[in-house]
C-alpha cells in the first residue's frame, strides 16, 4: 500500500487522526496523502505538521488519489457525492466513515461498479486506540477489504462485520466511549467523596478502566472470570458489585447500546 495515494475528503478530528496514524505506522508516506476541507487554515496547519498535500477543492484530491476516505458529516454527504460522482471511477476505492449511512447510498449515488467499503470507527482513533467495524460493499475486492483493515488497524483494532451489524457496531463501539466517560467520572467522584483529590481520583479511575480492558483483551478470559478473580467472599469488591447490580448496571449498559443502535438505524433511513 505504500505507493498508493490516499485522499481524505474532510480533515476533522477523525480524518486527521487517521492521517497521523497511517503515517506513524509506515503504511503511507506524507507525500502520498492528500486532504481537502472547507476550512483552509486548518488544512494549512495539517500541511505544516504532517507534510501532506492539501486543497479546498475536493475534486483535486479525488483526482490525485487511489483510495478515498470520506470523512464528512452525514448531513453533507449527499452534496459531496453528487459533486464528485463523475470524478470517482471504479479504479478508486471509496471508504466512508459517515455514521448510519448504508453502502447502498454510495452505490446508488456513484458510478456503476464503484468499490465502496463502509467503516464505523470511534473517537479513540485520536489516541490510536479506536475500535472499528468494517463492511465491504458488493463491488469491493478482497484487496480492498485488506487495505481498509490495514488503514484502520493503524489507529486501533479493526474487525470485519456484515453490514447488517453496522448499526450494532455504532451503538457498541461508535457511541461506547461516551458511555464509559461517565463511568470514569462517577468512580472518581466516589473517591473524592471519600477524601481523595480530584486529579488523583481521575487518574486512578481512568487507569483502572484501561487496565481492566487490557486484561480482557490480552488474557482472552471471560469478563465474569476476571471479575471473580478479584472478588473475595465477604470482601470489599463483592459489596461494590452488589451495589452496581442493585442499580441495574447490566440492563443500563445493554439498553444504552440498543438505543444507540436503534437511533443509527433511524438515521440510515433518512
UniProtKB/Swiss-Prot annotation:
Keyword Cell membrane assigned: no
Molecular function terms, GO-annotated: pyrroline-5-carboxylate reductase activity
Enzyme Commission code(s) on record: 1.5.1.2
Tagged with keyword Endoplasmic reticulum: no
Protein keywords: Amino-acid biosynthesis, Cytoplasm, NADP, Oxidoreductase, Proline biosynthesis
InterPro entries listed in its UniProt record: 6-PGluconate_DH-like_C_sf, NAD(P)-bd_dom_sf, P5C_Rdtase_cat_N, P5CR-like_CS, P5CR_dimer, Pyrroline-COOH_reductase
Uppermost EC category: oxidoreductase
Pfam families membership: F420_oxidored, P5CR_dimer
Pathway assigned to this chain's UniProt record: Amino-acid biosynthesis; L-proline biosynthesis; L-proline from L-glutamate 5-semialdehyde: step 1/1
Matches recorded under PROSITE patterns: P5CR (PS00521)
Annotated catalysed reactions: L-proline + NADP(+) = (S)-1-pyrroline-5-carboxylate + NADPH + 2 H(+); L-proline + NAD(+) = (S)-1-pyrroline-5-carboxylate + NADH + 2 H(+)
A single GO BP: L-proline biosynthetic process
Localization, UniProt: Cytoplasm
One GO CC term on file: cytoplasm
Phenotype of the disrupted gene, per the record: Mutants are auxotrophic for proline.
Family per similarity comment: Belongs to the pyrroline-5-carboxylate reductase family.
UniProt-listed NCBIfam families: proC
Function: Catalyzes the reduction of 1-pyrroline-5-carboxylate (PCA) to L-proline.
Name of the protein this chain belongs to: Pyrroline-5-carboxylate reductase
Annotated source species: Methanosarcina acetivorans (strain ATCC 35395 / DSM 2834 / JCM 12185 / C2A)
Gene name per UniProt: proC
